[in-house]
From Swiss-Prot:
Gene3D superfamilies: IlvD/EDD C-terminal domain-like
Listed name of the protein: Dihydroxy-acid dehydratase
Function as written in the Swiss-Prot or TrEMBL entry: Functions in the biosynthesis of branched-chain amino acids. Catalyzes the dehydration of (2R,3R)-2,3-dihydroxy-3-methylpentanoate (2,3-dihydroxy-3-methylvalerate) into 2-oxo-3-methylpentanoate (2-oxo-3-methylvalerate) and of (2R)-2,3-dihydroxy-3-methylbutanoate (2,3-dihydroxyisovalerate) into 2-oxo-3-methylbutanoate (2-oxoisovalerate), the penultimate precursor to L-isoleucine and L-valine, respectively.
Record keyword Amino-acid biosynthesis present: yes
Required cofactor names: [2Fe-2S] cluster; Mg(2+)
Length: 611
């Protein structure tokens, strides 16, 4: 029978000093011997996805105490990728993931906590906490802050839906007036919560459901809706149950590594492909799998991308649907249900509710259950009122969206495409692979051949696009922006948004060893591995080179003779791999990250061989 980890600091005379300090935090005599559960919050006023989380930790803590545990809250950092976008701040975003994972490990191990409830939401916070949970392997439940409501405004006598990406695109569009741009900006992000489309934050929160580590509705129930409160309360109650099963009954099945198995990672990736999620999720799943000691690689992603259809299209892949519409259609349990009926799911994986995934789908998939409480939950909708407060409204749709032919979520028979929403490409320029969100690519350019125009940084690319250097037919190559080369692997949302602003969204491709925001769409290919700073062929591309992209056949090639490439390699080796014409101040902290970082095909995690 496993002993409570916290007993290390709460039992025996030699721990009198530690107990004295525990008492100073408010613990009473009868608390010693109860499981100490870390409430890992990420409240910050910098991030709309986290601005409403201040009281959530204590909400969970109170429920833990009622259920028989001792709750102790601490906070992690949280970077807002949208605010950090387009300037040097973005260099810090991906490295913050690893800092979050480490900080959770430090706090939990230093204080010998027995379990965790992770209150996350935005882009790097959920992945960082996920890495920590799988590294520590103690009972853990995730509950996120929830999605933002979609923005709405009236233009040309029509009410249109908006999100952050619309503000970026229209802000740089020279054909849009200042008045309209300002109107869109003021309407795009109306409430607290993670940005309203299937961007990275919401994608990752959805994937925690598929992994079995969060409760049904975690990925889709709006931050503003009163129904979301119950997820926090249930997480507080259930984590104590998991502690009892593990520490009192020696039930190893409740541990994160027992839940997030190889089969569960396959399920998460299948969900990601089916819902056209962010390409960043690939990076984070690869990193999390390594923490879980699960053999999940780019080869698995390639395998799954060839068999899983695209069952849902949500912003930025369409403006018709946002996360509030996914919830109305039954949320993640509904998409998993469609995958299960198509024979594309490992339905015997386990969840933190103690159910198999098949049992959980049967209970929560609106296409299977007649439970009015479940249907009521998935009718929770937006109120359209600007607010930074959680649980501030209880608006409901009249009906759920159960149209699997033309609705937000489709069955396999009526899929948006039988090819999934994400694909891995490979070829001489990406020997270890690269990733494209196919759900966001126009069918007319699934095969593309164009001339390279090369930029050594995101900043140069932005200047080139807005300055008119990029023309229709170009393959925009942005290199030395990988985990090492950045360092930090910046997101390229501004270059892709500005291509649209300049009317080139369907006329160009973009290839980078950096990454993309979940808000990116178009023929945007990222995570090119190996990256330029690791000697990848992308570092040898010159202006005017031909690059061929063939998404249906999963190929990408630099069409340059081998002899010419060998000569370029020799010239590059002679001078060393260094991006030309780039002035970028890089802090010591970022240099440390870059020194240890692996390429994107390994999840940009630290290279353990260097330690």
């Amino acid at each position: 029978m496993p002993k409570l980890r916290s007993a290390t600091s709460t039992q025996g005379r030699n721990m009198a000093g530690a107990r004295a300090l525990w008492r100073a935090t408010g613990m009473k005599e009868n608390d010693f011997g109860k499981p100490i559960i870390a409430v890992v919050n990420s409240f910050t006023q910098f991030v709309p996805g986290h601005v409403h989380l201040k009281d959530m930790g204590q909400l969970v803590a109170e429920q833990i105490e009622k259920a028989g545990g001792v709750a102790k809250e601490f906070n992690t950092i949280a970077v807002d990728d949208g605010i950090a976008m387009g300037h040097g701040g973005m260099l810090y975003s991906l490295p913050s993931r690893d800092l979050i994972a480490d900080s959770v490990e430090y706090m939990v191990n230093a204080h010998c906590a027995d379990a965790m409830v992770c209150i996350s939401n935005c882009d790097k916070i959920t992945p960082g906490m996920l890495m920590a949970a799988l590294r520590l392997n103690i009972p853990t439940i995730f509950v996120s802050g929830g999605p933002m409501e979609a923005g709405k405004t009236k233009l040309s006598d029509q009410i249109i839906k908006l999100d952050l990406v619309d503000a970026m695109i229209q802000g740089a569009n020279p054909n849009v007036s200042d008045e309209v741009s300002d109107q869109i900006e003021r309407s795009a992000c109306p409430t607290c919560g993670s940005c309203s489309g299937m961007f990275t934050a919401n994608s990752m929160n959805c994937l925690t459901e598929a992994l079995g580590l969060s409760l049904p509705g975690n990925g889709s129930c709006l931050a503003t809706h009163a129904d979301r409160k119950q997820l926090f309360l249930d997480a507080g109650t259930q984590i104590v149950e998991l502690c009892k099963k593990y520490y009192e009954q020696d039930d190893l099945s409740v541990l994160p590594r027992s839940i997030a198995t190889k089969a569960a990672f396959d399920n998460a990736m299948s969900l990601d492909i089916a819902m056209g999620g962010s390409t960043n999720t690939v990076l984070h799943l690869l990193a999390a799998a390594q923490e879980a000691e699960v053999d999940f690689t780019m080869a698995d992603i390639d395998r799954l991308s060839r068999q899983v259809p695209c069952l849902s299209k949500v912003a930025p892949n369409t403006q018709k649907y946002h996360m509030e519409d996914v919830h109305r259609a039954g949320g993640i349990m509904a998409i998993l249900g469609e995958l299960d009926r198509a024979g594309l799911l490992n339905n015997q994986t386990r969840t933190v509710l103690g159910l198999s995934l098949a049992e959980q789908i049967a209970k929560y998939d609106i296409m299977l259950t007649k439970d009015e409480a479940v249907h009521k939950f998935f009718r929770a909708g937006p109120a359209g009122i600007r607010t930074t407060k959680a649980f501030s409204q209880d608006t409901r749709w009249d009906t759920v969206d159960d149209d699997r032919q033309n609705g937000c979520i489709r069955s396999k028979e009526f899929a948006y495409s039988q090819d999934g929403g994400l694909a891995m490409l490979s070829g001489n320029i990406a020997l270890d692979g690269c990733i494209v969100k196919t759900a966001g690519v126009d069918e007319a350019i699934l095969k593309f051949k164009g001339e390279a125009i090369v930029f050594e940084s995101q900043e140069d690319a932005v200047a080139g696009i807005l300055g008119g250097k990029v023309r229709a037919g170009h393959v925009v190559v942005i290199r030395y922006e990988g985990p090492k080369g950045g360092p930090g692997m910046q997101e390229m949302l501004y270059p892709t948004s500005y291509l649209k602003s300049m009317g080139l969204g369907k006329a160009c491709a973009l290839l980078t060893d950096g990454r993309f925001s979940g808000g990116t769409s178009g023929l945007s290919i990222g995570h090119c591995s190996p990256e330029a700073a690791a000697g990848g062929l992308i570092g040898l591309v010159k202006d005017g080179d031909t690059i061929e992209i063939d998404i249906p056949n999963r190929k990408i090639e630099l069409v340059v003779p081998e002899a010419e490439l060998a000569q370029r390699r020799a010239e590059q080796d002679a001078k060393g791999w260094k991006p030309a014409n780039r002035e970028r101040e890089v802090s010591f902290a970022l240099k440390v990250y870059g020194h240890f970082a692996t390429s994107a095909d390994k999840g940009a995690v630290r290279d353990k061989s260097k330690i």
